[in-house]
Amino acid sequence: MKNRFIFILFLSILINYGVHAQDYINSVGLRGGLSQGITYKHFVTTTDAVDGILAMRWGGFNITGLYERHIDAFDVDYLYFFYGAGAHIGFWDGDSNPWFDENRGYTVIGIDGVIGLEYVFREIPFNIALDWKPGLNLIGTTGFWGEELALSFRFIF
């Protein structure tokens, strides 16, 4: 029943907004990589956006907020290069994380960078993005985490 409701909601949004993928203000979708989750992006200017990510990994989750700048890439229509920075807070289960020494919960707070490419489809209201989001944990289990390479698929509106 829940899946049917989500599908009907998604379909009604798609029909009501029509096809206008050339320009968009908001997007929501799935992010996949070593961490999987959801992503929501909102443009605050024509080039700058805020991106919120809720990702799950190692029996816990991570909340990330990023500020991103978008510029045209390689003279290809609807292809954008983006870069930015932000912060995260994560809550992890030590039993599920191979890098933690003790079997207890961990909380980390840190800063992030992001660099990537995004393509906006003209014919359908979707985009696809590939990015690398390294992070540096400053509080909790400190250290650099550079393996966050991800592919995101978003519905734009």
Where would I find each of the regions flagged by the language model?
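Flexible, solvent-exposed loop segments that connect beta-strands
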Residues: 48-52, 91-107
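Residues that define the transmembrane beta-barrel architecture of outer-membrane proteins
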Residues: 24, 32-36, 59-63, 79, ...
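Gram-negative outer-membrane beta-barrel proteins
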Residues: 36, 60, 73-75, 91-97, ...
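Outer-membrane beta-barrel translocator domains and adjoining extracellular loop/strand segments
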Residues: 65-66, 94-101, 140-147
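Residues on the lipid-exposed face of transmembrane beta-strands in outer-membrane beta-barrel proteins
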Residues: 30, 38-42, 65-69, 85-87, ...
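Bacterial N-terminal signal peptides
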Residues: 8-16
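Short loop/turn motifs that connect adjacent beta-strands in outer-membrane beta-barrel proteins
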Residues: 20-25, 47, 72-80, 121-126
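Transmembrane beta-strand segments that form the barrel wall of outer-membrane beta-barrel proteins
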Residues: 22-34, 44-58, 85-89, 130-138
